[in-house]
Amino acid sequence: SNDLKFVGVTVQNPSDSPKTDGLDPESCKNVEILGVRFSLGDDCIAVKSGKIYMGKKHKTPSENIHIRQCLMENGHGAVTLGSEMAGGVVNLTVEDCIFRHTDRGLRIKTRRGRGKDAILSNIIFRNLTLDHVMTPLVVNCFYFCDPDGKTTYVQSRDVYPVDDRTPQVKKMVFENMECTNCHVAAAFFDGLPEQKIEEIYMKDISISYAEDAKCDVPAMSDGVEKSSKRGMFARNVAKLTLDNVKIEGQVGEAYELEGVDELIRR
C-alpha cells in the first residue's frame, strides 16, 4: 500500500498480551504516523517487507516512513524493523516521540537468510525521550525466533560467504536522545562478521540507569547473556561515531567494542 496516514489514533491492548503489535506497515511507501498512542504487549510499530520467497518475487521495500509525536508504551519494541524484511527498509525517520516501559526503543531484527535485498538504509532517530526502556537501541543480526532461527547457519559467529541470502544494515543516525531509567544495556549492536553494520552515527545522547534495574537479555540471539546496567556493546560495525554520547551509572565498561573498524569520538 502507498500514501498512508495514521493521525491521532489510540491502539491499546493489555501489556501482557502476546502477538498484539500495534501497527505493521509491510512493503508500504509514503507512510505518516502522527500523534498515535500505543500501549500494548508486543511491538508498537513493526516495519516489515516480507520473507525471502516474497522478496524474490515482489522485491518491494518499505520506504519513506515518517513517525513523529507518538507515545509508545509497554511493548517489546517501540519501533521495530523486521524480522521479515526481504524487500528492505529505506528512508525511515522517527522524531519527537516518547518511549516508556518498552523492552527496547529501536529494535532491528534480521539474520542470514533474509536475502541480499534485505537492506536497511537511511534510518534516523532524533529528538526522543526514553524512560524505563530496558535497552534503548538494539540492532540484532542473529535474531533467533521462527523455525529456522536457531540453525548453525543463522547463529554462527564465523565468517560466511556473502551471497544472495545475506542481509545488509547500512547507515543509521541517532541524535538528541535522553534515555533515563534504563535497565539492561545502553545499546546492543551485533552485526554479521561477513557483512558488518556499515555505519552508526550517534550525537547528543545521554543514557542513565534505574536504581533497581532489572536483569534480562538485550537481544534475542544465541550466546547473549542476561545483564543489568550494561554499557554499550558494539560488534562488527564498520564505522561508529560517538559525538557527545554520555553513559552514566553502568556496571563495568561503558563501551565494549569488538570488530569495530573505525571509531570516531568527539
Which sequence ranges carry the predicted segments?
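Extracellular/periplasmic carbohydrate-active domains that bind, remodel
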Residues: S1-R266
